[in-house]
Amino acid sequence: MSSTTPSNPSTPAPPNYAAFQTELYTSAILHGRKPTVTTDPNKLEAQARAALPLRSYNYVAGGAGERATMDANRQAFRRWALVPRMLRDTSAKKVGVELFGVKYDSPILMAPVGVQTIFHEDREVGLAKACADIGVPYIMSTAASSTIEEVGEASGSGHRWFQLYWPNTDAITRSLLSRAKTSGFSVLVVTLDTWSLAWR
């Protein structure tokens, strides 16, 4: 991670994720300042509901149909755990990954989310800029409310991937892929299991 925050060069960035956790902890305990976003994942949905217009919240939180897939995904995720190894030297921490020949400082990616104009006026452009600032690859949805070119420009030197809902028309597919390549998207993420719009 860089020693300054890219969007504000005068603001020092935490040197690593553990330091950021310590910063949040110290700020809350010593100064009574809570983080803007909750650190409890079970409270994220309630916080989003309080912050978003109802239409926006319902779109992202509702799932499809009876939410069976959404519920199953959450249950599956809960079965994963970090198992610490005791009495080991942990002074050299590495959480980075290499994907498609590129090394990233973090294993985190920004998943594709379409129609972001219903969440914030900055749309996908704003999120792409934020991802570039912190070095997280941004995956743009085919269903984005910003254009491929806008996101490409907003990303600057940041890594950007393009998610494709495969169109029925080959000419449209070629056009999307050509525009993405020209705009600096380096990885293609293909969604194959969305044959029709879900009941939302």
Question: Where are the regions a protein language model picked out?
Answer:
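Short, acidic/turn-prone active-site loops that include or flank metal/cofactor-
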Residues: 144-146, 164-168, 194
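Conserved, mostly hydrophobic/aromatic
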Residues: 53, 110, 131, 190
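A structural motif shared across PLP-dependent enzymes of the aminotransferase-like
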Residues: 65-68, 118-123
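Alpha/beta enzyme core
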Residues: 115, 129, 153-154, 168-200
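A glycine-rich phosphate/pyrophosphate-binding beta-strand-loop-alpha-helix module
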Residues: 121-160
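Glycine-rich phosphate/pyrophosphate-binding beta-alpha loops
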Residues: 112-118
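An N-cap/entry alpha-helix motif that binds or orients negatively charged groups
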Residues: 3-101
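Hydrophobic faces of well-ordered beta-strands that scaffold small-molecule active sites
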Residues: 108-111, 138-140, 160-164, 188
